[in-house]
Amino acid sequence: MIITEIVRMKTVEGITKDEFIGVVDGLERNFHSRQKGFIDTELLYHDEENEWYMIQHWNSKDDLKEASKKIFIDKDAEDFVKSLDKQSVKMLILPRIATWANTL
């Protein structure tokens, strides 16, 4: 069963949008893409709330949990972890029920 993780977060003071996008790019290339069961990531930004959203898909909840344990100790995730306002981070982990795609 595919698992979707939705993370809402803010960055610490002084990090620009472009800088954070670069940090996330490094995280995806050097950390998430190497984790068992990782499928993909989307990054979104809410201007009015000054919040970032990361949507990820994983092959299983166990794969997601293993990667989540590693993110705080892996050197390839260090810049990402340091850039977050840790009190702002909120996560939802949900099983995919159905998907629809454009078939035209």
PLM ranges: what are they?
Residues 10-22:
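Short, surface-exposed ligand-recognition loops at beta-strand->loop->(often short) alpha-helix junctions
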Residues 30-39, 57-92:
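An amphipathic, aromatic/His-enriched active-site/gating alpha helix that lines ligand/cofactor pockets
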Residues 24, 28:
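Short amphipathic alpha-helical/adjacent loop interface patches that line ligand
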Residues 21, 53, 72-73:
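Residues in and immediately flanking transmembrane alpha helices
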Residues 1, 9-12, 42-49, 53, ...:
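Glycine-rich beta-strand-turn "strand-cap" elements at beta-sheet edges
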Residues 15, 49, 62:
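Short alpha-helical
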Residues 18, 68, 103-104:
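Short, charged, solvent-exposed linker or helix-capping segments at domain edges/interfaces
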